[in-house]
UniProtKB/Swiss-Prot annotation:
Species of the source: Macaca fascicularis (Crab-eating macaque)
Membrane side Extracellular: residue ranges: 36-91, 147-163
Assigned GO CC terms: endoplasmic reticulum membrane
Protein name, per record: Ubiquitin-associated domain-containing protein 2
Keyword hit for Glycoprotein: yes
Underlying gene: UBAC2
Length: 345
């Protein structure tokens, strides 16, 4: 919506689609038709601590009771779907699960710290909903999404492809009195999980058997078909932003066309030109001898070793093993570059 995240829609993002549809529908249902049931979904840490209502840690942290929070979090989840396409549904779900669990612990710590140091009681006033993992996604968004300037205002200030996302996050951050506690706990959990602190990414993860089960049962329900009638250009808010996005698209297409042209020429001309200086080897080739008395060219270096773990990650995203191997070799084992290359083709 706001950033260049590949194809529009929810193609290759079934988990993001389910997080958009199910909690939003339940939030509307509770607000319009079942307001008397909202008390069951109140996020009340005081009741959890004193009355042992442990179930509130689950029910109170899934569905938003404020429609403004529902709207803002849905927009953010839609824009953060790029991480599901990049990492795969299993790793994306593991990140959300890990940050969701860790943020509950940080909520307790922050509430107790406020009570101890400042005498502020916030245990019964925390906002409900799937908010902490949404704030946690700002950590990989800040660290891994490149910043592209699209306009410059007031001297050093500039508008980038990430500005509107940060503004939307700020709107969600200021939508309630104590939502900043949930936001800080979400950011802290995102930092812990993204930096692999204390190996939490190995403990709080989705098992492979569970991922396969949901891929067989729920993924067909929430999967979306590949868009066919689009130019793969993000729709900017102004003509200048759209023009900048088209220029970025042309640059990417030029790079990929040069890459493909180099591959074709290398296959046709063999070893007459050492294309390995320009492009990493994609396939192992046999040495080719040319004119009888002419000394053959130096042997091409062996193909780059590819990590099977990275191949497995790309295959979990839906790519074939051959395409995954070729993209990883072409990108010198850079998983992010290989993923972006495959998503563009």
């Amino acid at each position: 919506m706001f950033t260049s995240t590949g194809s529009s829609g929810l193609y290759k993002a079934p988990l993001s689609k389910s997080l958009l549809l199910v909690p939003s529908a339940l939030s509307l249902l509770l607000a319009l038709l079942l307001p008397h049931c909202q008390k069951l979904f109140v996020y009340d840490l005081h009741a959890v601590k004193n009355d042992f209502q442990i179930w509130r840690l689950i029910c109170g942290r899934i569905i938003c009771l404020d429609l403004k929070d529902t709207f803002c979090s849905s927009l953010l989840i839609y824009n953060f779907r790029i991480f599901e396409r990049r990492y795969g549904s299993r790793k994306f779900a593991s990140f959300l699960l890990g940050s969701w669990v860790l943020s509950a612990l940080f909520d307790f710590l922050l509430v107790e710290a406020m009570q101890y140091f400042f005498g502020i009681t916030a245990a019964s006033n925390l906002p409900s909903g799937f908010l902490a993992p949404v704030f946690a996604l700002f950590v990989p968004f800040y660290c891994s999404i490149p910043r592209v300037q699209v306009a410059q205002i007031l001297g050093p200030l500039s508008i980038t492809n990430k500005t509107l996302i940060y503004i939307l996050g700020l709107q969600l951050f200021t939508s309630g009195s104590y939502i900043w506690i949930v936001a800080i706990s979400g950011l802290m959990s995102g930092l812990c999980y993204n930096s692999k602190m204390f190996q939490v990414h190995q403990v709080l993860c989705i098992p492979s058997w569970m991922a396969k089960f949901f891929s067989w049962t729920l993924e067909p329900i929430f999967s979306s078909s590949e868009p066919t009638s689009e130019a793969r250009i993000g729709m900017g808010a102004t003509l200048d932003i759209q023009r900048q996005q088209r220029m970025e698209l042309l640059d990417r297409q030029l790079m990929f066309s040069q890459f493909a042209q180099g591959r074709r020429q290398r296959q046709q001309q063999g070893g007459m030109i050492n294309w390995n200086r320009l492009f990493p080897p994609l396939r192992q080739r046999q040495n080719v001898n040319y004119q009888g008395g002419r000394q053959s060219e130096p042997a091409a270096p062996p193909p780059l070793e590819v990590s099977e773990e990275q191949v497995a990650r790309l295959m979990e995203m839906g790519f074939s093993r051959g395409d995954a191997l070729e993209a990883l070799r072409a990108s010198n084992n850079d998983l992010n570059v290989a993923t972006n290359f495959l998503l563009q083709h």
